[in-house]
């Protein structure tokens, strides 16, 4: 009997610790202040969104980004525009709000503001719109987007040279911008034979889906059409060249 009581006490302690850990995982600290973590994986975001007859979907990117591609039924809302507050006032506080941006910076900023205003349920797509596109979920894309590439043509490009480095990213993604000087430095060198290709995720959802890209920047080095190296984040020239030399 005594052993059973001890076992029950231990079990309750474990459950309490686990529960505490789960609660802590939903809280972020910024400048010493606690903020709720609204980040939601694409699958859950998609599932919760589909439960709504008239979902409140907010695109926290710029108007230019929104015009290139956006989630169906999404409303573009930019903190930089004059009628920003008026747009928020049109939302129903008791209904879930679904937010996304190129990553989670701008969408989290809006989410925190909504939370301060008393909105009850908020979801932020993480790690950004690339996760939605990579999962193959619906996306409305401008047919006039000059950065759009036909999937079959892209696959042909991968075999057009022995080494092809593909940079999956976006002009609006801060870390992606840091990749550009790396590629410029790579292209300025004459001691390698690596062709670079840039793929804008917003303009090429079919490519992003087919190659299962869910985070940006993502760089993949191909040799004769086959992937031999992958980097999520900002690489160095040495990493890229080193990956080709190892083959």
For each feature predicted by the language model, list its residue ranges:
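Sec-dependent signal peptide recognition
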Residues: 2-9
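Short pre-active-site segment immediately N-terminal to redox-active cysteine/selenocysteine motifs
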Residues: 161-162, 169-172, 215
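Typically the conserved alpha-helix immediately C-terminal to a functionally engaged Cys/Sec
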Residues: 175-190
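A cytosolic small-molecule/anion-sensing beta-strand core signal
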Residues: 223
């Amino acid at each position: 009997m005594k052993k059973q009581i001890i076992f029950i006490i231990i079990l309750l302690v474990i459950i309490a610790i686990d529960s505490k850990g789960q609660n802590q995982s939903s809280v972020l600290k910024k400048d010493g202040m606690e903020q709720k973590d609204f980040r939601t994986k694409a699958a859950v975001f998609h599932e919760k969104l589909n439960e709504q007859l008239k979902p409140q979907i907010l695109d926290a990117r710029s108007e230019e980004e929104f015009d290139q591609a956006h989630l169906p039924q999404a409303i573009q809302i930019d903190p930089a525009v004059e009628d920003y507050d008026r747009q928020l006032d049109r939302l129903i506080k008791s209904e879930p709000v679904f937010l996304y941006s190129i990553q989670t910076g701008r969408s989290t900023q809006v989410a925190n503001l909504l939370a301060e205003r008393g909105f009850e349920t908020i979801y932020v797509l993480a790690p950004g719109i690339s996760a939605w596109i990579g999962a193959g979920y619906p996306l409305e894309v401008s047919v006039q987007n000059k950065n759009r590439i036909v999937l079959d043509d892209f696959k042909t490009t991968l075999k057009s040279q022995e080494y092809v480095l593909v940079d999956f990213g976006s002009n609006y993604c801060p870390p992606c911008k840091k990749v550009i000087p790396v590629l410029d430095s790579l292209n300025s060198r004459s001691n390698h034979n690596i062709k670079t290709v840039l793929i804008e995720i917003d303009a090429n959802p079919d490519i992003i889906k087919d190659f299962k890209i869910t985070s940006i920047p993502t760089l993949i080095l191909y040799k004769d059409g086959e992937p031999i190296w992958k980097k999520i984040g900002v690489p160095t020239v040495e990493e890229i060249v080193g990956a080709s030399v190892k083959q």
